[in-house]
Amino acid sequence: MLEFAVSAPFDPAFDISSSIVPATFPWLSLSILFPIVGAFIVPFVPDDGDGKQVRWFALGIALTTFLITAAAYLTGYDPSYSGLQLSERVSWLPNLGLTWAVGADGLSMPLILLTSFITALAVLAAWPVTFKPKLFFFLILAMDGGQIAVFAVQDMLLFFLAWELELLPVYLLLAIWGGKKRQYAATKFILYTAGSSLFILLAALAMGFFGGGVPNFEYSVLAQKGFSTGFELLCYAGLLIAFGVKLPIVPLHTWLPDAHGEATAPVHMLLAGILLKMGGYALMRFNAEILPVAHAQFAPLLVVLGVVNIIYAALTSFAQRNLKRKIAYSSISHMGFVLIGIGSFSELGTSGAMLQMISHGLIGASLFFLVGATYDRTHTLQLDEMGGIGQKMRIMFALWTVCCLASLALPGMSGFVSELMVFAGFATDEAYTLSFRIVIDGLAAIGVILTPIYLLSMLREIFFGKENSELVSHSNLVDSEPREVYIIGCLLVPIIGIGLYPKLMTDSYSNTISALVRRDVDAMERITRPTAPLIRSTSLVPAVFSAPKLTQASQPVS
């Protein structure tokens, strides 16, 4: 029997909303199933061999999916409410605790919109694909439904299934349409991600069966089970590994440069724009929200790992002469700010982490699309073989410049706001000592300084370096076409809009973030040592890690 509601509400004692808003129309189920059903129709679309009809059909499905998610946001989602909305629940196998439960709150709704938006643009970016177009667009649409499901489902076993569903399309998109080392990159991707997913399954089963009785895997139930501290720490560690691979966290990152190095432009957009955000979202949803006591223990480790991401990846990006790998390491560096924000106990810092995921999704997709467009013309990714093409590709240079400025966090762009929020949120987070905050913000600032250096030097080498006469004289070296300008324009509109008026995005999730931070702060205050005895009790760790009792729970979101 279908009923638009979920099981027991969150316990108010944990500062989780005590009521859930049921859906009046199954928007989220439709947004998940529509692209998947569309994918299975793709093989039956009449085609003359060039893939034209298939491309238009796939674009129609992707755009309709985006309109469905937009309608869900506009008609059924209230940004001022912190709890679960658009909730649907279908009893599936009750004896096994399996339920089709979907819903959206401030953590998931912005990322659902981001997923459908970038997928629609990725389909448009895939217009030149003529090799096995039916299979290509089948995989893109199936991946769209799977990624939306990751953000929308409210059952941990369903989450695991959705997490696995998007792995196979990515593997095939890399293995069939990738570069010369595509088999290696695809195999490495599947080994890393599928192997780490085992930790999600084990944690889900352990948490669902905890306490005996009929198992239940719904997030609302798991959040109220009252796990023991040791159990939480064990589950948290396993989930951190699984989600750390996807984010990625150094040293679990090595699959990403290889995958980006061999992927095509539309696959780049999906990897950078959506796939990495799944890791950040899952850390917030499970590690921070459902396992708050363990999160209070692990939070300083997340902060340190975030700084390592920022500095290590930025320095590594300097050494890269391959354009795709350079941007890939830049992505890893920027995701370090997400870790710092999640590890903070302030609303401002955590809100900054959320905004950084959205911002990087847009900026990363734009940069990797431009990498693909440039490669289509130059047929090389080596910076040493480029140079002097700015005179023949002036519009392309302008697009590259604006997107690089967005990536280096130029004021007026979304990246500036998100990184500033993380910096300010952590600097005012009284859960940590002043000296620790100064050290972390100071080290993270190094990454902010390094980013414009390697990005602007990259621009110079591509467009104004030593001229490659053979490359410059090549007939393929033409300027950007209207389709490419349109795609970048669509990405720049929200990048600049959020940069000029952040409330366009922050208002959609600020109340959910407030509830999440209050829950984590409450957990911190209830354990013996306010923060992270797992890390801070050892004498081998400097006193900079010790923390006083929290006196101020949160900071306002700007």
Swiss-Prot record:
Main location: membrane
Enzyme Commission designation: 7.1.1.-
UniProt keyword annotations, A-Z: Membrane, NAD, NADP, Plastoquinone, Quinone, Thylakoid, Translocase, Transmembrane, Transmembrane helix
Keyword field contains Iron: no
Signal peptide range in chain numbering: none
Matching InterPro entries: NADH_Q_OxRdtase_chain4, NADH_Q_OxRdtase_chainM/4, NADH_UbQ_OxRdtase, ND/Mrp_TM
GO molecular function: NADH dehydrogenase (ubiquinone) activity; ubiquinone binding
One GO BP: ATP synthesis coupled electron transport
Coiled coil location: none
Keyword Cell membrane tagged: no
Residues that span the membrane, as ranges: 25-45, 56-76, 90-110, 111-131, 133-153, 157-177, 189-209, 230-250, 264-284, 298-318, 327-347, 353-373, 397-417, 438-458, 485-505
Entry-linked Pfam families: Proton_antipo_M
Subcellular localization, as worded in the UniProt entry: Cellular thylakoid membrane
One GO CC annotation: plasma membrane-derived thylakoid membrane
Family classification: Belongs to the complex I subunit 4 family.
Protein task: NDH-1 shuttles electrons from NAD(P)H, via FMN and iron-sulfur (Fe-S) centers, to quinones in the respiratory chain. The immediate electron acceptor for the enzyme in this species is believed to be plastoquinone. Couples the redox reaction to proton translocation (for every two electrons transferred, four hydrogen ions are translocated across the cytoplasmic membrane), and thus conserves the redox energy in a proton gradient.
Protein name per UniProt: NAD(P)H-quinone oxidoreductase chain 4
